[in-house]
From Swiss-Prot:
Keywords: Acetylation, Electron transport, Membrane, Mitochondrion, Mitochondrion inner membrane, Phosphoprotein, Respiratory chain, Transit peptide, Transport. It is a peripheral membrane protein. It comes from Rattus norvegicus (Rat). This is Cytochrome b-c1 complex subunit 1, mitochondrial. One of its GO terms (cellular component) is mitochondrial inner membrane.
Length: 480
């Protein structure tokens, strides 16, 4: 009787639990409607509005309730558009932009930016150049005016050019102290040898010492054209106001090329190769290994980003030890293989670099490469649904958290319009991520990793870095 009573009680308790789980009140709890809320949140993101001026300059904005705004000009020009003779000209101009314009000479530009409590920044990459200002939303008219002045009226006084040479040369010395920056420049130099993508953004020191006012003027007149520019804004910005301001200040930007000499991108070939810079005086070795990756618009990028998320990243300061979700991180901890590692997928217009960078002591290099290549081969042959689901969730989190604040959103708008021709909505990114499954990861990884020639760059105490032919043989498995 007692046992029967227990069974009846258990059955009635189960039925009560089932009734509770079907309760509309419980289903409204945040924890049980997280998926729906996530999708709805993506669909409720403000729309990116895009307009085009008569001269071809694109104006794009995303309005939000932020009291601040970030406004920037993105230009489709970088070191890959430069020649061996003028390599570094774009980086030089970026520095001169902070030193005044024809209308605001000397430190007048800096004082005017500071007077409204704004922050001016600029950067150059191999394909893009950007100038951006973050300020209060009420100062939008002044911000657009300042950006227009910087882009159209950079001061190229001989005295300022000479002064800036020394500044850039000192910066280059500081950059050389960053082993990670050096090894990635080495990786580009060997992977894209003989092509414009091999050129560093800063250019060689010989060019910095040699570039003249004429070189910089020619660079400006050749590349700073309206159809290659995007004026982007994010934050407390109304699109119509931004468009009106752009019409006032940017409509005079030229869209005509002298003698119809429209710059074009030269396709850059990838070469499986290596570059080694051995320096036993350094405490740790930096090694980067990469295969050729897809260009910006290639749909394979999403599956490859999921694959990179599965391999993950690691730093010796992390907690978790051998219980980290990344198999490579667990092996690295258990065997004390490295100080850190990270995967990367660097995309350009038609090509890219897909691989990993790690920092370790001299005696662990060979083992680290062995286990890294083992993870790549495993993804090519036996990626599972559970780890793909984990990778997709990691990618979702990175996608959302990256766009936190007006500056990251503004950068995403400007970069997206130059690379994709449009701003891809978060909801569309989510649908692309959702389509990825284990079969897709295996197929895409096999396409890019399996039996492919890698590019390898090593810097530091790298005596134990394996011979290239041995590294190449690790890019496939003999399966029977």
């Amino acid at each position: 009787m007692a046992a029967s009573a227990v069974c009846r009680a258990a059955c009635s308790g189960t039925q009560a639990l089932l009734r509770t789980c079907r309760s509309p009140a419980l289903l409204r709890l945040p924890a049980l409607r997280g998926t729906a809320t996530f999708v709805q949140a993506l669909q409720s993101v403000p729309e990116t509005q895009v307009s085009v001026l008569d001269n071809g300059l694109r104006v794009a904005s995303e309005q939000s309730s932020h009291p601040t705004c970030t406004v920037g000009v993105w230009i489709d020009v970088g070191s890959r558009y430069e020649t061996e003779k003028n390599n570094g000209a774009g980086y030089f101009l970026e520095h001169l932009a902070f030193k005044g314009t024809k209308n605001r000479p000397g430190n007048a530009l800096e004082k005017e930016v500071e007077s409204i409590g704004a922050h001016l920044n600029a950067y150059s990459t191999r394909e893009h150049t950007a100038y951006l200002i973050k300020a209060l939303s009420k100062d939008l008219p002044k911000v657009v005016e300042l950006l227009a002045d910087i882009v159209q009226n950079i001061s190229l006084e001989d005295s300022q050019i000479e002064k800036e040479r020394d500044v850039i040369l000192r910066e280059m010395q500081e950059n050389d102290a960053s082993m990670q920056n050096v090894v990635f420049d080495y990786l580009h130099a060997t992977a894209f040898q003989g092509t414009p993508l091999a050129q560093a953004v800063e250019g060689p020191s010989e060019n910095v010492r040699r570039l003249s006012r004429t070189d910089l003027t020619d660079y400006l007149s050749r590349h700073y054209k309206a159809p290659r520019m995007v004026l982007a804004a994010a934050g407390g910005v109304k699109h119509q106001q931004l468009l009106d301001l752009a019409q006032d200040h940017f409509s005079s930007v030229s869209q005509v090329y002298e003698e119809d000499a429209v710059p074009s991108i030269t396709p850059c070939r990838f070469t499986g190769s290596e570059i080694r810079h051995r320096d036993d005086a350094l405490p740790l070795a930096h090694v980067a290994i990469a295969v050729e990756g897809p260009g910006w618009a290639n749909p394979d990028n999403v599956a490859l980003q999921v694959a990179n998320a599965i391999i993950g990243h690691y730093d010796c300061t992390y907690g978790g030890g051998v219980h980290l979700s990344s198999p490579l991180a667990s092996v690295a901890v258990a065997n004390k293989l490295c100080q850190s590692f990270q995967t990367f997928n660097i995309s350009y217009s038609e090509t890219g670099l897909l691989g990993a960078h790690f920092v370790c002591d001299a005696m662990s290099i060979d083992d680290m490469i062995f286990f890294l290549q083992g993870q790549w081969m495993r993804l090519c042959t036996s990626a599972t649904e559970s780890e793909v689901t984990r990778g997709k969730n990691i990618l979702r989190n990175a996608l959302i958290s990256h766009l936190d604040g007006t500056t990251p959103v503004c950068e995403d708008i400007g970069r997206s319009l130059l690379t994709y021709g449009r701003r891809i909505p978060l909801a569309e990114w989510e649908s692309r991520i959702e389509e990825v499954d284990a079969q897709m990861v295996r197929e895409v990884c096999s396409k890019y990793f399996y039996d492919q020639c890698p590019a390898v760059a090593g810097y530091g105490p790298i005596e134990q870095l394996s011979d290239y032919n041995r590294i190449r043989s690790g890019m496939f498995w003999l399966r029977f």
